[in-house]
From Swiss-Prot:
Function according to Swiss-Prot or TrEMBL: Functions as a nucleotide exchange factor (NEF) for Hsp70 chaperones which accelerates the release of ADP. Required for fully efficient Hsp70-mediated folding of proteins.
Intracellular or extracellular location(s): Cytoplasm
One cellular component term from this protein's GO annotations in UniProt: endoplasmic reticulum
Biased composition annotated in UniProt, kind: Polar residues: 16-33
Region of interest (Disordered), residue spans: 16-35
Any one GO BP annotation for this protein: regulation of translation
One Pfam family here: HEAT_EZ
Gene Ontology molecular function, alphabetical: adenyl-nucleotide exchange factor activity
Coiled-coil ranges from the UniProt annotation: none
Entry protein name: Hsp70 nucleotide exchange factor fes1
Keywords recorded for this protein, A-Z: Cytoplasm, Repeat, Translation regulation
Length: 216
């Protein structure tokens, strides 16, 4: 990644949590920018219009970096989720090579990272057949089923169910993959119509209520 873009990402993360109460008046804006560490090169990168693709790649690098702490990774994740609310950006995950590193984060040791990964996946695939297909291709459905039924963190389980719900609605290949990996007692081996919203809702309601052992 370009050094200026990397520095710009770091600056953005650092200043996204800065209190606004100490902001100077307009006449001191230039000095304040320097004090906060914005270099001319970084400003050039910013106003030169870093593309959404650049920002998505930079965020993913931060999410996998050992040099970025959890708090700032979660900020980067939030920025990433907002970017992929755009269907064009969601469809760019595959050509940018971001599906694999995103799916890998479903198995992160930190519950908040797993939760955000599931949230981003749910956002990307919602009403987006191309992204729904990629979720199947990258074998994320079984991981999401495991998360929704065994993860010890309730918020993480909730986002895993959200991702599954978004993935299977009106997309039969994802629904077939889900049914194949449901725990014992669910509709295993049965054909569930991905276009039947009542049937989809029934499965999701069961997943939300799925008991998780306290030792999980």
């Amino acid at each position: 990644m370009d050094a200026n873009m990397n520095n710009l990402l770091k600056w953005s993360i650092q200043n996204s949590t800065t209190q606004q109460s100490d902001a100077p008046n307009a006449s001191n804006n230039t000095a304040d920018s320097s004090a906060r560490g914005l270099t001319p090169e970084m400003l050039s990168a910013l106003f030169g219009g870093p593309s959404d693709a650049d920002l998505m790649k930079a965020a993913m690098e931060a999410l996998h970096s050992d040099e970025v702490d959890l708090e700032n990774k979660l900020i980067a994740f939030d920025n990433f989720e907002q970017l992929i609310e755009s269907i064009d950006n969601a469809n760019n995950l595959e050509p940018l090579g971001l599906w694999t590193p995103l799916v890998e984060l479903l198995q992160h040791e930190e519950a908040e990272m797993r939760r955000m990964a599931a949230w981003c996946i749910g956002t990307a695939v919602q009403n987006n057949e191309k992204a729904q297909d990629k979720l199947v291709v990258f074998n994320a459905v079984p991981k999401l089923v495991t998360m929704s039924t065994t993860d010890s963190n309730p918020a993480t389980r909730k986002k895993a169910v959200f991702a599954l719900s978004s993935a299977v609605r009106n997309y039969q290949p994802a629904m077939d993959e889900l049914v194949k990996h449901l725990p014992e007692g669910y509709s295993q081996g049965e054909k569930v119509d991905a276009g039947d919203m009542d049937a989809v809702d029934a499965i999701m309601d069961r997943l939300r209520a799925h008991p998780v052992p306290s030792s999980a």
